[in-house]
C-alpha cells in the first residue's frame, strides 16, 4: 500500500513540474511586441517596379521592411535594399505574402506569444511564422538582410 502511495505522489510531482514548465514558457516582453499598421504617407525614394511603399521601423542598413504596392490597395510585405545616400533604385529582395496581397490598414504584429503575423484589416491571416510559444523574445532585421526571431539567449528560432 505504501508503494502505491509513493508512486501516486511521484506522479503528482511530475504533473506539477510539467504544468509549471508549460506555464513558464518564455514570452515576448512588452517592450519588444509591436503592431505596424499599413496606413499613412508613402515613401519618397524611387523603388523597383515603380511601386508606392510605406517603410516600417525594423531597419538595418541597407535593409528595411516595407509594405509596397503596384496595384491600388494590394500590398506586399517586403524587405527593401538600398542606401539612403544613393540615388540608385532600391530593390525588393524578399516578400512575405507574394500572390496573397493585403489591403490598407493590414497589420504586422509580433505578439507576446512570439508569432509574427501579417493580417489583413478584416483579420484574415496572409502570412505568419508559426512560432507561437517557441521561446521567441525579439524580432530583428540584421545588416545581412536576414530577419530573425530570437530566444532569450540570442539564438535564432527562425
Predicted regions and their residues:
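Extracellular/secretory-pathway, disulfide-rich ectodomains
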Residues: 2-158
